[in-house]
């Protein structure tokens, strides 16, 4: 699986800015991480890249500054098969067949106050997200949805789970580890802690929502989930606080490679409950791949 356009950046991302001829796309300031986003890598480029890697795409919806209509139109653009505006728009861009994007995430870290999120109140998140879910699911009932979870706030997550049960298939969990103090080995203790925390998070999910849906309003014109809610570990990685202002430029050393292997082992240890896992980030932010206009390393 590969996740696009990423995490916090989704707060100001609008998918229509990244379709059509590249020379006609409008460059915009990246309000989250700085710099300029020319939108040259948009939906179609991402799908092509996923096909090249032979992986499933995961698209993240902007529920902060976006709208339910915008989200549903993105689903139609990607998966539409009928003679409709956005399906035809995709065809006009050179893609006659649908992309069949299966996984869609309902925002990212929406309770994070420093970011552009506005859902510190989980009840507000549930209320707002339902409008997105309905239009998206009515556009394509087959899609699988990932709701926000707050790995450090179980009560927030419980409220989201209870409020969205039946409609969602995954609950997200984000986990980063780094060195704590002078000892370079402290990172491994943190991974051990994440192993335990993932198990406890999974137990909380199972205790909050039953494996099978118990109550589903018949007037919903789309099906409820048919499997237990699983964890989407859609951000995990190594985060060493370094360069200001965001501390998001990592210099990886041997211990980070070993730590990554240990983290993967912890994920496998909890594989019964984890339905997907995505390394974060991939390019330029906390990334193993760094680029500029001339090269990449």
Show the residue positions of the predicted features.
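Conserved, mostly hydrophobic/aromatic
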Residues: 2, 50, 74, 104, ...
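Aromatic-lined carbohydrate-binding surfaces of glycoside hydrolases
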Residues: 2-24, 44, 62-78
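Aromatic- and acidic-residue-enriched carbohydrate-binding clefts of CAZyme catalytic domains
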Residues: 8-43, 48, 83-115, 178-181
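The substrate-binding groove and active-site-proximal loops of carbohydrate-active enzymes
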Residues: 25-40, 56-65, 106-126, 139-151, ...
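Glycoside hydrolase catalytic-domain groove-lining segments
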Residues: 28-32, 36-39, 45-48, 127, ...
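Short mixed-charge
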Residues: 80-100, 207-224
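Aromatic- and acid-rich polysaccharide-binding/catalytic face
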Residues: 96-116, 148-149, 157-195, 229, ...
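Aromatic/acidic polysaccharide-binding cleft in carbohydrate-active enzymes
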Residues: 226-297
């Amino acid at each position: 699986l590969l996740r696009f356009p990423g995490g916090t950046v989704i707060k100001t991302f609008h998918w229509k800015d990244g379709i059509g001829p590249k020379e006609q796309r409008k460059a915009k300031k990246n309000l989250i991480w700085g710099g300029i986003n020319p939108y040259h890598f948009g939906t179609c480029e991402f799908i092509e890249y996923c096909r090249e890697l032979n992986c499933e795409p995961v698209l993240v919806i902007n529920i902060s500054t976006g709208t339910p209509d915008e989200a549903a139109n993105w689903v139609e653009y990607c998966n539409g098969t009928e003679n409709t505006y956005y399906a035809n728009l995709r065809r006009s861009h050179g893609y006659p067949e649908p992309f069949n994007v299966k996984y869609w995430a309902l925002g990212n870290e929406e309770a994070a106050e420093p970011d552009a999120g506005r859902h510190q109140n989980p009840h507000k998140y549930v209320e707002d997200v339902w409008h997105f879910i309905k239009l998206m699911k009515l556009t394509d009932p087959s899609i699988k949805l990932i709701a926000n979870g707050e790995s450090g706030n179980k009560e927030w997550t419980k409220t989201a789970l209870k409020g969205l049960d039946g409609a969602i298939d995954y609950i997200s969990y984000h986990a980063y580890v780094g060195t704590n103090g002078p000892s370079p080995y402290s990172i491994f203790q943190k991974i051990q802690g994440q192993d335990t925390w993932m198990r406890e998070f999974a137990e909380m999910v199972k205790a909050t929502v039953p494996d099978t849906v118990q109550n589903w309003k018949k007037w919903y014109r789309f099906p409820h989930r048919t499997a237990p809610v699983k964890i989407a570990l859609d951000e995990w990685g190594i985060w060493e606080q370094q360069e200001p202002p965001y501390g998001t430029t990592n210099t990886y050393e041997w211990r980070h490679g070993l730590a990554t292997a240990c983290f993967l082992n912890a994920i496998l240890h909890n594989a019964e409950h984890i339905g997907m896992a995505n390394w974060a980030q991939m390019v330029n932010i906390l990334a193993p791949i760094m680029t500029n206009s001339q090269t990449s390393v």
